[in-house]
């Protein structure tokens, strides 16, 4: 009888310890999820910034990587990548370097094509067109004979100019992950075609699928902030061996090189 009571007491204590441990883990995971969301919110709060020249007066996260007196450089990058059945993968996008020290901006419009040759080796070719920004307008700095391409560059709008994120907490049922060894972190959400940002992308790009995308937010570096780390977001419409359709955007603040 006494032995039975001791056994029940021991089992009770074991179950209690497991329950407390599980609650502690859940609380720790919930705290980490909140920290990851807060980290992404700092970047998402920049959307929209319709006038890119506003970045001259925007301060970003600073650490010991910045030299004294360096105001830093914003790196803004938007590109669309499309690969459909039987066709090569092509990405078209623009990257800008917004120098807060000189209040000047330069960059490149980049067209990249990837494919596999008959032996299965990956091949690629890339063409860069240098640009500058003045009065919130993109201006090619070298002559472009192709009128259609020149107009595409001059009319280019970055996602930060029209994208709008009220709050990442508005997105439900997200898959949030954290790898402390890298460190890296991410959050993935299934969107609908009625989502404001999805509508904006479809308005500006000929996206050859009606499938609603997933939103993937990715980052690496210290969650508390790091100029070495990098953050970007992707709208993934299709991702498999035969087809890939996704839009990538990033805004990062770095020491001026």
Curated annotation (Swiss-Prot):
The record's InterPro entries line, in alphabetical order, gives:
Csa, Csa_sf
> What are the protein's UniProt keywords?
Cell membrane, Lipoprotein, Membrane, Palmitate, Signal
Q: Does the keyword Cell membrane apply?
A: yes
Lipid link (S-diacylglycerol cysteine) located at?
23
Pfam families to which the protein is assigned, alphabetical: DUF576
**What's the chief localization of this chain?**
membrane
Q: How does it sit in the membrane?
A: Lipid-anchor
Q: What is this protein called?
A: Uncharacterized lipoprotein SA2275
Which species does the entry assign this protein to?
Staphylococcus aureus (strain N315)
